[in-house]
């Protein structure tokens, strides 16, 4: 059953000299438990689609359905969707408040949603992403890039989402740390039964993570790939 449905999605922005079309008529669907990826060069519209699905980009046209709920352009997410759809951003440092301890960063979403047993939930989240309990006392600048991205993933997992949106989650990390984070994401997906929508320009990341993928250029989805095509590296030729 498709838990994400996107039909004829278009997004435009005001730009110098006129209107820029960031996404033009994109259509795709995600099945429960799979990883579907969008690949393409920077500026092709991948991250804009993620922002629409996260409720961050509210000016768009088309039909979007998340977990059986039809999304209305211009409106904030309501109810369970605010918990069930979470996003991990490209730059972990920029997405973490520099003056908040890791404990505060992780505890605040739980408090906002009226959760109980906050101490235990924060400790559990850190353990799930392989961080020691004492990391909760630190500030973002006291952590490595890989550790900060683990915190960002832990924060997204705290509300036990069904859909995780991943915007270039390893592009700011060293190669050795990239593999650790990708393997962590795969393990967590299996443990929690989540569905991933991954954005990347890295053909190796797409092949490692994805069940299916689509190649974008100039706001348009030009080609789709199943798992066999990804294993054969067909997406590399499209991206070349």
Where are these regions (language model features)?
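Conserved ABC ATPase signature
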Residues: 139-143, 147
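Helix-to-loop junction immediately C-terminal to a conserved catalytic motif
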Residues: 54
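ABC ATPase NBD coupling module
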Residues: 16, 70-86, 100, 104, ...
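The feature captures the beta-strand-to-loop junction immediately N-terminal to the Walker
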Residues: 39-41
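A short, proline-enriched helix->beta-strand linker immediately N-terminal to the Walker B motif
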Residues: 158-162
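Conserved ABC ATPase "signature" region
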Residues: 117-134
